[in-house]
Amino acid sequence: MNTIFKQKNTHPFSNAANRLDRLPISRVHFQVLTALGIVYFFDLADLFTLSNVAPALIEHWGIPLSTIANVTAASFLGMFLGASLGGRLSDRIGRKKALNLFVFVFSIASLCNAAAWDIPSLMTFRFLTGFGVAAAMVITNSYLAEFFPSSVRGKYISFCAMIGLIGVPITNIVSAFVIPLGSWGWRLVFVWGAVGLIYFFFIHRLEESPRWHENRGEYAKADAILTRIEEQVEKEKGPLPAASQPKVSETVKQNAGYAGLLKGRNLKITIVLSAVWIFETFGFYGFASWVPSLLKSNGVTMENTLWYNVLHSVGAPLGALLGSMISERFQRKWILAASAFLTAIAGLLYGMTFIPIMIIVFGFIVNITERVFTSNLYAYTSEPYPTEYRSSGSGLAYGLGRFSNIFGSLLVGFIAVQLGYISVFLFIGGCWLACSLLLIFFGPNTNAKQI
């Protein structure tokens, strides 16, 4: 089934996009979802370990909210560097090799968090965890965007996010049980984050991205991978339809760098996506990272805070499931704009009550609408860029969002201490409203476009 084409410029061409696009969803695709779903699961779980542990650190180490802000800032500095450098590295050495490296980094770093003996050591380990987590997330989304057919790309990226978001309530439940065990209980939460190493039992299911090989001019390698995939799909689904002919305008671009993200059409995409990720990060982590500490600082017991967090987070996988179901039914920019607006409203209402049932209800709604947003944003961020810029571009946008939260964490801490509890939620709501407006006026349409 070798189908290496010749273009008018005499370069051979493996036609990866068209060959992948005409494949029916099969066992091969679900094997990819399983392996990358594990990455998503522990990647997202690790993002929430610190917010769960923070009230225990305040109680057992006697530290103020401002110190938690510093630890959080270190995490986001690591995320910025991980997303920016990890995406670039995967463009150079391949999606699979880079993903293996960074899953190992964030899993081992999470285990090291459990051994932290003071704030500087915890900040160091959180920096390394953030570095690995963000790099792995960017690479996972690039791989999914390049592997799944364009007609269902967003649906399955959102579905993978749903698998990952199941890790959020499970992590919160683990935290609620182990943290109260004693002054050492919080350390077990970080041990849980290291279980992501089980990914390495599934890496044999992953091929290198054939589109990455093709973009480097390694047509024979791309064709060999595509042929193996096609043979597996044919055994399960029967004969495949012929792939469309490659476009003669497609050429090899192996040495794309960051400078190309600031030129032509890429410049607008980079500005819009970076701004959306910055406001999303302020809004998302302003809520997720700070709510447990804010509730405890306003008189809610640590046990109640942990269980409120569990009940809130049940909405996370439900939101991602809903996001997956509607991802291809509407343009993603409008799904994103609407869900950001609803998150702004629910977040504001959350900050206006201390009635337990209302805290649970509004927190649950925030988790649903925010996860509809996030699960579609991961797909949306990977789509507008051409292959040679995909990981670098999405990594830069994602990374700038994480970098901004170095200051966002300090800003939320300042607002909480100086302006009060409700002011934090006014800030969070404003960030989500800014996301909505940016997407309405400047977001590109991306659904079902071949990338």
UniProtKB/Swiss-Prot annotation:
Q: Which residues lie on this side of the membrane: Extracellular?
A: 51-60, 119-124, 179-182, 292-305, 355-357, 418-421
GO CC terms:
plasma membrane
Q: Where in the cell is it found?
A: Cell membrane
GO molecular function (one): transmembrane transporter activity
For this protein, the record's Gene3D superfamilies field holds: MFS general substrate transporter like domains
Q: Which residues lie on this side of the membrane: Cytoplasmic?
A: 1-29, 82-97, 146-157, 204-270, 327-333, 379-396, 443-451
Keyword line: Cell membrane, Membrane, Transmembrane, Transmembrane helix, Transport
Classify the protein's membrane topology as the record does: Multi-pass membrane protein
Tell me one Pfam family matched here: Sugar_tr
UniProt keyword Lipid biosynthesis, yes or no: no
Q: Does the keyword Membrane apply?
A: yes
Name the CDD domains for this protein.
Answer: MFS_SV2_like
Entry's transmembrane regions? 30-50, 61-81, 98-118, 125-145, 158-178, 183-203, 271-291, 306-326, 334-354, 358-378, 397-417, 422-442
Q: Quote the InterPro entries the UniProt record gives.
A: MFS_dom, MFS_sugar_transport-like, MFS_trans_sf
Family under the similarity heading: Belongs to the major facilitator superfamily. Sugar transporter (TC 2.A.1.1) family.
Protein name, as recorded:
Putative metabolite transport protein YyaJ
**Name of the encoding gene:** yyaJ
